[in-house]
Amino acid sequence: MLAHLRPALVLLLVLTGLTGFAYPLLSTAIAQAAFPHQAHGSLVRKDGRVVGSTLLGQPFDDPRYFWGRPSATSPVPYAGQASAGSNLGPTNPALAEAVKARVDALRAADPEGAAPVPVDLVTASGSGLDPHISPAGAEHQVRRVARARGLSEAEVRRFVARHTEGRLLGLLGEPHVNVLLLNLALDGAR
């Protein structure tokens, strides 16, 4: 009987060693050598302190800052360990209520704004942790941020334009703005 089990056990041990140890170690070593910044989480530092990551959204609610997409993680917003969508379907009344509350909050923050609220500012992404908003989402907030910072709308629009990333290879994805990097650039302006 042991003769029949031996090949299976040897294969189990070999594959465990290869896929459980050798492959992860090799992948990590290659990532550390080729892409050290990304391998460490694409961390953003300010004055020597880590203030965030370009890969994860953060809650911003101060009028001086651009606000990102809503987080679907709860009870703590933007908690990586709770990453998931809200799983609320389009016909679920709770989704409609949440979107309406978010629209109302954005309108209250900029009562003079009459433009429709871009959908990415009121709906969570699939992961609930998206660090980006659309250029339309940024444009929707320009007046509020400019007023709160004492800048002209044209100045704030220039910041948005400088921080708008295009499509990958010119055709994949949509143009987007990293909210953390934009807010840090605005902080550095004055």
From Swiss-Prot:
Membrane among keywords: yes
TM region positions: 10-30
A single GO cellular-component term on record: plasma membrane
Name the UniProt record assigns to this protein: Potassium-transporting ATPase KdpC subunit
Quaternary structure note: The system is composed of three essential subunits: KdpA, KdpB and KdpC.
Xref: PANTHER family: POTASSIUM-TRANSPORTING ATPASE C CHAIN, POTASSIUM-TRANSPORTING ATPASE KDPC SUBUNIT
Localization per Swiss-Prot or TrEMBL: Cell inner membrane
InterPro entries: KdpC (IPR003820)
Primary subcellular site in the record, as a coarse category: membrane
Membrane disposition: Single-pass membrane protein
Superkingdom: Bacteria
GO terms for MF: ATP binding; P-type potassium transmembrane transporter activity
Keywords: ATP-binding, Cell inner membrane, Cell membrane, Ion transport, Membrane, Nucleotide-binding, Potassium, Potassium transport, Transmembrane, Transmembrane helix, Transport
Cysteines joined through disulfide linkages: none
Gene responsible for this protein: kdpC
Similarity comment text for this entry: Belongs to the KdpC family.
Main function: Part of the high-affinity ATP-driven potassium transport (or Kdp) system, which catalyzes the hydrolysis of ATP coupled with the electrogenic transport of potassium into the cytoplasm. This subunit acts as a catalytic chaperone that increases the ATP-binding affinity of the ATP-hydrolyzing subunit KdpB by the formation of a transient KdpB/KdpC/ATP ternary complex.
